[in-house]
From Swiss-Prot:
PANTHER family: NITROGEN REGULATORY PROTEIN P-II, NITROGEN REGULATORY PROTEIN P-II HOMOLOG
GO biological process: regulation of nitrogen utilization
PTM per Swiss-Prot/TrEMBL: Uridylylated/deuridylylated by GlnD.
Keywords: Nucleotide-binding, Phosphoprotein, Transcription, Transcription regulation
SMART domains, per the entry: P-II
Any one GO CC term of the record: cytosol
InterPro entries given in the database record: N-reg_PII (IPR002187), N-reg_PII-like_a/b (IPR011322), N-reg_PII/ATP_PRibTrfase_C (IPR015867), N-reg_PII_CS (IPR017918), N-reg_PII_urydylation_site (IPR002332)
GO molecular function: ATP binding; enzyme regulator activity
Sequence positions bearing O-UMP-tyrosine: Y51
Designated name of the protein: Nitrogen regulatory protein P-II
Length: 112
């Protein structure tokens, strides 16, 4: 099993969620986050003064999938979240040792 974390632009969330649903992903956790990478933020003008905005709003999606679903999940995120512009985000893939559904006690792939 793998955990996929995708940091994407907030306006892409609904499209990515729909794309993941189309490939059989039934659950995820979404968190509003702020950060920056190579784009380093931007400047904004407010009441005549310029301000540096270091951390940009992003959305972090966390999805646990079977090993067989990993490539399909990554492909769905890439195709949907990519704009071709700086700040599209990143995808991280981690190993998951064990999953337990609290309500039923089911474990691992049965609990996903």
């Amino acid at each position: 099993m793998k955990k996929i974390e995708a940091i994407i632009k907030p306006f892409k969330l609904d499209d990515v969620r729909e794309s993941l649903s189309d490939v059989g992903i039934t659950g995820m956790t979404v968190t509003e986050v702020r950060g920056f990478g190579r784009q380093k933020g931007h400047t904004e003008l407010y009441r005549g003064a310029e301000y540096m905005v270091d951390f940009l709003p992003k959305v972090k999606m966390e999805i646990v999938v079977t090993d067989e679903q990993v490539d399909q999940c990554i492909e769905a995120i890439m195709e949907t979240a990519q704009t071709g512009k700086i700040g599209d985000g990143k995808i991280f893939v981690y190993d998951v040792e064990r999953v337990i559904r609290i309500r039923t006690g089911e474990e691992n792939e049965d609990a996903i």
